């Protein structure tokens, strides 16, 4: 009897080993057969937003820095992360995609690792201008398109939905509840006239007001330093921001034709950031209003930074979305019922004088 039991267990073990081998072989065959780079170019772009050649360039640039301990090829991990960011799928759906075939824990590790690698190696794709020539190029771009001198960017915030954060000693859940009643990160960003992000700050929860985020913003600190050196450059923001020498808001209750003209041009120029958000979220549906990132703040922020890096790479290379593909940004607006001006002491006084000098230079 004991011999029969022993034989039975040996047979079961052998069968399990054979089935395990068949599964591994099938996965290998499936991965080889379903190479996403074999797709037609238009199909590839539909799924991954990048042209194949540019995708290969990124893979070749990042692969030498890959230290993740896994047998899954870097190319497959990278393309799976792109698929997740572009389509906003659940991890299990990404893992079951016919080109991936990975377990949910595996795809989870891949997404976090690859996004961190992209931010670490490619963070320079999102940066403030660092030369006089670059500033002048942006100023010229805004002036030629919208007729306002000295503008180096448009600023606003957008909300990216996340799941309810777990309670802890450092996390207060209601801090993440925004004005529309869902949990989010309030992401501050600055873009130039070509919709390229020059600054992104994803550190603040959804309940934070845009002007509160601006108070400690690295972009603000940089501009304060620039103005102390006598530089004439400013951002354009809506009336939810304070009027400062380096941040122009619309004129409250415009009385003269020049002031009305300024407000009209201001609206058109500032709309570049709204459009940039729309393009970003249309490319990367994982951070769109229709999706919710099921991650804690720190991980979700890494995904947001990765998406803005990829967005800039595409924009700089002239790879644009069609107008019909761009969705409007549906972030909850700030609680500003009428145009008013937020006073901030000396900065407000200096900002009002600087804005008036700018208004006086407008050509009708």
How would you name each of these model-derived features?
Residues 1-364:
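Short, polybasic Lys/Arg-rich linear motifs in disordered N-terminal/cytosolic regions
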């Amino acid at each position: 009897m004991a011999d029969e039991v022993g034989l039975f267990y040996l047979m079961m073990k052998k069968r399990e080993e054979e089935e395990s081998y068949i599964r591994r072989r099938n996965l290998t065959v499936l991965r080889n057969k379903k190479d996403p780079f074999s797709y037609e170019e238009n199909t590839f772009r539909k799924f991954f937003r990048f042209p194949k050649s540019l995708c290969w360039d990124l893979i070749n640039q990042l692969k030498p820095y890959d230290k993740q301990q896994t047998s899954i090829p870097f190319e497959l991990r990278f393309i799976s992360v792109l698929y997740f960011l572009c389509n906003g799928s659940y991890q299990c759906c990404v893992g079951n995609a016919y080109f991936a075939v990975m377990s949910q824990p595996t795809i989870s590790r891949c997404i976090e690792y690859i996004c961190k690698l992209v931010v670490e190696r490619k963070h320079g794709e999102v940066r403030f201008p660092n030369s006089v020539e670059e500033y002048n190029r942006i100023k010229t771009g805004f002036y030629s398109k919208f007729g306002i001198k000295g503008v180096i960017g448009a600023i606003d915030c957008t909300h990216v939905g996340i799941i309810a954060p777990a309670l802890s000693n450092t996390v207060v859940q209601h801090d993440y509840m925004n004005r529309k009643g869902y949990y989010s990160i309030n992401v501050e960003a600055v873009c130039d006239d070509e919709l390229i992000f020059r600054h992104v700050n994803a550190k603040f929860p959804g309940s934070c007001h845009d002007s509160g985020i601006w108070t400690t913003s690295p972009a603000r600190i940089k501009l304060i330093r620039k103005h102390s050196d006598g530089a004439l450059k400013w951002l354009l923001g809506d009336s939810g921001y304070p009027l400062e020498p380096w941040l122009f808001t619309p004129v409250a209750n415009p009385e003269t034709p020049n002031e009305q003209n300024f407000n009209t041009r201001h609206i058109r120029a500032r709309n570049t950031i709204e459009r940039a958000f729309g393009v970003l979220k249309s490319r990367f549906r994982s951070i769109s209003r229709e999706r919710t990132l099921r991650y804690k703040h720190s991980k979700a922020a890494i995904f947001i930074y990765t998406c803005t890096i990829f967005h800039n790479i595409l924009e700089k290379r002239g790879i644009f979305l069609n107008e019909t593909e761009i969705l409007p940004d549906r972030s909850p607006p700030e609680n500003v019922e009428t145009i008013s001006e937020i006073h901030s002491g000396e900065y407000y006084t200096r900002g009002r004088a600087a804005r008036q000098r700018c208004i006086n230079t407008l050509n009708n």
